[in-house]
Amino acid sequence: MKAIICGAGIAGLTLAWHLERSGWEVELIERAPAFRGSGYMIDFYGPGLQVAERMGLRERLRALRYPVDELSYVDRDGRQTSHLTMPPGMQEVISVLRGDLARTLQDDVRSPVRYATSIDSVEQDSGGVTVQLTDGTRRRADLLVGADGAHSRVRELAFGDGSRHLRYLGHQVAAYILEDRRLSERIGMRYQMLTVPGLMAGAYALRDDRLALLFLRREPEPRIPGDPAATLRRHYGELGWILPEVLTRCPDPPELYYDQVTQVEMERWSQGRVVLLGDACQAVSLFAGHGASMAMAAAWILADELAGCEDPVAAALRYQRRIQPTIGEVQRFGRRFIRWMAPAGRRHIIARDWMLRLAALPGVSRLFVNSLSPGGHNLIRSSSEVASPHPA
């Protein structure tokens, strides 16, 4: 059988890896002009890490990890107001750049990626699916997988108006990386953040004297500004800490990542021989902090259902039934976490800082950190294990 996968991000690459090894022919297309090595730090754990283990990638990801085990909040003068240190003995968390994870996956995928290409039209019949690509070619396959992100073109073609599936969470996010040895050494291997009502700015050091910046802004209007860099300077330039300095060197897109914070909610993830994967159908948002892990888990489950099957339409429905309830749980967690990560008022910031101080007490930190972890830790079981009343 053959699958066309639209989207060569974490979800699409993970699915390609598994389908190739179960005998499928895979064609990967990606609308970006080249591999995207950008993105912010992700804390990779739980089901995604279990999938990486099954793929033989865990040790390679460990070699790329950043030893970030402290979250520190500072004021406008850079003085620490509260902090949280990861207690020993917790489940393994690998802090890694999204681009490093994607590169690790792509290095092990056999199928080449056709870049600067998307889909113009989709036609289905009882025997397969035919797509018209933006380069003018037509391709046919047994299954089309839309793994092309929250603003999915495949979703729009198969399900109609794509925006109706988006749940805007009232915030916009930006991220970029700059080289600065002095600031990188000052921040060190920890997440350091400054929060004022409606605005959050964070920084963490990377290898090679680089510094990563992350910005989160409360914004009722979902429209992306025409000049994102100028928008960041206008809102954050007077907040103190390291912000005036780093914002003078803020690049323009694409070096500057800027987007809405959204979730994608859908009743159905497939339409015949077209199935959605990753953020195209299950975006959990930055607030949930579990997107890459859930994307890899979903790809593994879809591949598990497709392996050896003769009916990809039925396999797509089984895949949705296995993971959609967990995605809903993680999305609800993300919406609850907004008031913690992006406090709307001063009293919310004070309450959060006091909670962090309490969490530092002996015996409390483990309970507190566990409360910040969404579900999904029992997802990675084969279809035979799911069907068994006594899974191994």
Per-range role (PLM):
Residues 1, 288, 304-392:
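C-terminal helical "tail/cap" subdomain of flavin- and related membrane-associated enzymes
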Residues 2, 25, 210:
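Residues at the starts of beta-strands that form the adenosine-phosphate
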Residues 3, 18-20, 45-159, 163-177, ...:
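Conserved N-terminal helical subregion
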Residues 6-32, 145-146, 174, 232, ...:
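Conserved mid-domain beta->alpha element of the FAD-binding
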Residues 124-125, 204-208:
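Short beta-strand micro-motifs enriched in acidic
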Residues 129, 200-201, 210-211:
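Hydrophobic residues embedded in beta-strands of well-ordered beta-sheets
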Residues 171-204:
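Flavin-dependent oxidoreductases
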Residues 186-187, 196-199, 206-207, 215-288, ...:
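FAD/FMN-dependent oxidoreductases across multiple families
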